[in-house]
Amino acid sequence: MLSVEKCPPPENSLLEKHLMNGNYVDCYTTTIDKPVSFPEFVFGFYTTWLFKTERLILKALVNKPSTDLQAKQLSNAEIDHFAAWTVEARSEGEILLCDFVGRTRSWLMVEQAGAATKLYFGSAVVPAKGSVSLDFGFRAMLGFHQIYSILLLY
């Protein structure tokens, strides 16, 4: 049975730089009993039925459409914009995206573990400019966000 666990961001990961006072950072991981390449993970993540639902919401509410072809291009480092996000940083086996408002980060990483692959998904939320803490709206949605993050890795 697949299990998803909360963990700290791996040391020296692209997400780790957002670990500072006032920011919210989370990281979840699961292990798959087969080799999974980074492009396969990124494409698979952004084309699940659950994430496609988020993509539809983004298209309807903020006019940020996306396609499976764009998810494939993102996974192959052919484009730097996808739906509501822009690539902030990439390295071998990981990607950090920033939303169009500049407050939320989305992060994916793969780590080979013998014949298995460890998959990571994390988020960072930074306070609004001029604020030292996250606003009530985000804090109110935190429980939903955490459950949603876990479901995205199933």
Feature locations, PLM:
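Hydrophobic ligand-binding cavity/cleft-lining segments
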Residues: 1-68
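Beta-strand/loop substructures that line and gate deep hydrophobic ligand-binding cavities in soluble
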Residues: 102-143
